Amino acid sequence: MGTFEKREKNGVTWLSATPFEKMEGIVQGFSTRLGGVSTEHLSSMNLSFSRGDQEENVRENFRRIADAIGFTPEDLVFSDQTHTTNIRVVTEADRGKGFTKPLDYTDVDGLITDVPGLVLATFYADCVPLYFVDPIRKAVGLSHSGWRGTVHKIGKITVQAMADQYGSRPEDIVARSGRAHV
């Protein structure tokens, strides 16, 4: 299963999947609610543009978590989660979608890529994040596993998508699940 350790930098707190920390080219983290600028019921690290927060607050929160973890927010690619098992193959053309460019896709609960520098982003409340890294093929995946996705085997579907797209072998993929918050 692997461990998640709490990390903090410049007042921003996140969780890091320790098995991935030493993997070359992998930058990852699971944000917490700590270290952002949002106020009131959205306090403080709100990363949703659809919850009624001011857009500049959400953008600043992304800048803060990006600086803490070590990526550029303009490299983000968002999912569009609707509790499906749909996986999107993310390419260079997707860079910034959801953050600097509008999404031009819907119903995507998993993202896979082999493009260095792209940052995949999925979002969670009480669902489970699934992380996938193929260190041989230099491919990664990230899936949102709610109860529907779990029942319909989104983890297996993500691994199969990586195999189909990048030639990943299941035995080479390092996978971790995050925690559900209920």
Residue ranges and their predicted role:
Residues 1-181:
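Active-site microenvironment for binding and transforming phosphate-containing groups
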